[in-house]
């Protein structure tokens, strides 16, 4: 059985659990951690202590970037499509349906200073 550490304040959807089973071709045990985190380093430490072999993280892009670049982790990312049709979840008046998981290999943030008009 594949053990996966799930870092999100949102519980996994049935469609997400089924997709993980399909991807890994075995049953999965999710260790769900809904607790807030202060940094990518804290997520990495909690994941390593969990004994899990994979990781799903719902976090800001800057945190995902640090997980990859500073902690050497490549978490799974749940792709959600904003749509009312077939929606599985509603958050603050917006509707979403799970699409697939992708592995985070890198995150590139391009930022520029804001110039006054």
Where would I find each of the regions flagged by the language model?
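Short beta->alpha connector loops
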Residues: 60-62
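Long, low-complexity, Lys/Arg-enriched
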Residues: 1-54, 65-117
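Active-site-adjacent beta-strand anchor residues
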Residues: 57
